Amino acid sequence: MQLKVALDWTPNVIHAGLYVAQIENLWKDSGLEVEYISVEIDNYQKKTTQRLAEGEVHIALSPSEHLLDYRLLRETTAPIKAIATVMQQETSAFVTLPDSGITRPTQLDGKTYGGYRTQLERELLTSLIQQDGGKGDISLVTPPRLDVFDAFLQRQFEVCWVFLPWEGVIAEQMGLPLNAFHLHDFHIPYGYSPILMAQEAVLAQEEEAFQIFLQAVARGYRQAAEQPEETAKLLVEHLDHPNFQDLAFITRAMQVIAPSFLNGQQQWGVMQAERWNAYVQWLDEHHLLKRHDGTHLSADQLSTAPLYTNNLLGIF
């Protein structure tokens, strides 16, 4: 079987375990062929969840809120389910430049946020500001998704949401230590991101192929977590992509991200009900859970159990 996997962004160290599995052919002798599809194919005009729901790919990487959107809030004949999480820890943050004078979220009132046109980003930032004592009064601009960080560095707006083991390392190597505001520091629960998702119907038909893929990828991520420097060398040597040309940069990025891949039991991919429930409860409290017709959906009406499974990871 050929599995097509839609990446959530251009290739980067989030995808390290995926590429380790491919480079080392960890699914050899299984008959499985795997193709990774980057958002670059259309400059991120179509979300990965849309590609998944429309049957273009078998697996999609995306934040948890995209799954909620397609699974619960839209009329869809192709329900999707999370089958693994890439990271256990939150690795993103809202950031400002060191010379901006903005060192706390409350100082973002009246400022401009450069966004990605995705669910919840404005609501999360507003809540972050309010949790720090501000009003949450921000303006929003939306450059092309793949250009947001460059526009931020050009000071077209004061704040953006970045992945610290990538954009954070870029800024670090430019001598720009970013002011980073983490959601968890302000008691805002955020879902797993990114997660791997698949259509339930396809999972039922091809369960063995998904198990082979996920268990190989888990080996790749364990290797990346335990040997970040060696993994960096492997990626730079084998990946013909502009993002993987600078060994010093990739090594530093791998060192930053490696502690986030595994849980306390040294397992990759496992999701916990408590985190899903806390996230959905927060969405309910902020009136962000809505059905496709716009009516409110409460956390009490939503069981998170059907949203995800750990059963394909081969560790239970």
Regions flagged by a language model, labelled:
Residues 50, 106, 123-126, 150, ...:
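Solvent-exposed, polar/charged alpha-helical surfaces in well-ordered, non-transmembrane soluble domains
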Residues 41-42, 67, 167, 186, ...:
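Positions that flank functional sites
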Residues 206-286:
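Secondary-structure end/capping motifs
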Residues 277-316:
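Conserved C-terminal helix/tail region of periplasmic/extracytoplasmic solute-binding proteins
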Residues 2-136, 140-149, 154, 158, ...:
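Short, glycine-/small- and polar/acidic-enriched structural segments
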Residues 135-140, 241-253, 289-302:
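Short, surface-exposed acidic
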Residues 151, 156-243:
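Pocket-lining segment of extracytoplasmic ligand-binding domains
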Residues 8-9, 187, 271-272:
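Short Gly/Pro-enriched turn/cap motifs at secondary-structure boundaries
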